[in-house]
């Protein structure tokens, strides 16, 4: 994974208040912070989606499916470890974790059972 994902967030010395996302390796989630607008480091993303797609690891597949307390009603995909497959869920838009994907294909690529796609080609 990108080395910058392992860094903590950095607001930088400037005084802007730009809402950005950084990857928190401990919680395996992308969290918000306010970026000053200059310097900082590479663990700084304009969207939660870009942050997750850059920094998430396969361990995210073992995390619980978290709707979060907000009420945005975004349809996403997550890996259900009990069912062993990717399922749809409604994400509230905040305080989620790395087990959220923007398409079934993306979820399967990260968390799918190895060889599943190959077997479909043989049928």
Curated annotation (Swiss-Prot):
The record marks 71-72 as: Reactive bond for trypsin. It comes from the Eukaryota. Keywords: Disulfide bond, Glycoprotein, Protease inhibitor, Repeat, Secreted, Serine protease inhibitor. Disulfide bonds join 5-55, 14-38, 30-51, 61-111, 70-94, 86-107. Its main location: secreted. Residues 5-55, 61-111 form the BPTI/Kunitz inhibitor domain. The keyword Hydrolase does not apply. Transmembrane segments: none annotated. GO terms for cellular component: extracellular region. Glycans are attached at residue 24. This inhibitory fragment, released from native ITI after limited proteolysis with trypsin, contains two homologous domains. Whereas the second domain is a strong inhibitor of trypsin, the first domain interacts weakly with PMN-granulocytic elastase and not at all with pancreatic elastase. This is Inter-alpha-trypsin inhibitor. The lineage of its organism: Eukaryota, Metazoa, Chordata, Craniata, Vertebrata.
């Amino acid at each position: 994974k990108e080395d910058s994902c392992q860094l903590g967030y950095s607001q930088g010395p400037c005084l802007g208040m730009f809402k950005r996302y950084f990857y928190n390796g401990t919680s395996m989630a992308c969290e918000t912070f306010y970026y000053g607008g200059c310097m900082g480091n590479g663990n700084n993303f304009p969207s939660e989606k870009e942050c997750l797609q850059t920094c998430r690891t396969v361990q995210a597949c073992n995390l619980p499916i978290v709707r979060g307390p907000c009420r945005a009603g975004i349809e996403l995909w997550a890996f259900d470890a009990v069912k062993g497959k990717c399922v749809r869920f409604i994400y509230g838009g905040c305080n989620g974790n790395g087990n959220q994907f923007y398409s079934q294909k993306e979820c399967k690529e990260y968390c799918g059972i190895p060889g599943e796609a190959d077997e479909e080609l043989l049928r």
